[in-house]
Amino acid sequence: MPVTGKLEFDEEKRASWFSHKGEIATPSYYKVYLAEHDVVTEMTPTERAVLFRFTFPENEHSYIVVDAFDKGSYVKVIPEENKIIGYTTRNSGGVPKNFKNYFVTVSYTHLRAH
């Protein structure tokens, strides 16, 4: 989840208000403004993945919180490549027993782990 300001890991505390009136939702594109964090969030699907783009305000306190806190997850921060890689096995059902949801993030600014 894209957040700004004080880094917050609690889901309830980092939640953001948004308006359905400001959403754009089509089968090939989704866009929403997260008001609490002043972040524009966009996503578009591919055949087997989704691409996200977060547009943050210009400040020194912008983050992407990756929820990978259970025993079925793996996260690796590669600061020299501005990249985060990993996977989670969390799901809502309807997937094979060995399911893993892999992710790769690439930042065009510097990255660091917290």
Model-derived features with residue positions:
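Broad, structure-driven detector of short, well-ordered beta-strand segments within folded domains
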Residues: V39-M43, V75-V77, Y102-S107
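An exposed acidic His-Trp-rich patch
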Residues: G72-N91
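Extended, loop-rich substrate-binding clefts of extracytoplasmic carbohydrate-active enzymes
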Residues: E8-P45
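Catalytic and substrate-binding clefts that recognize carbohydrates or anionic sugar/phosphate headgroups
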Residues: D70, I84, K97-F99, F103
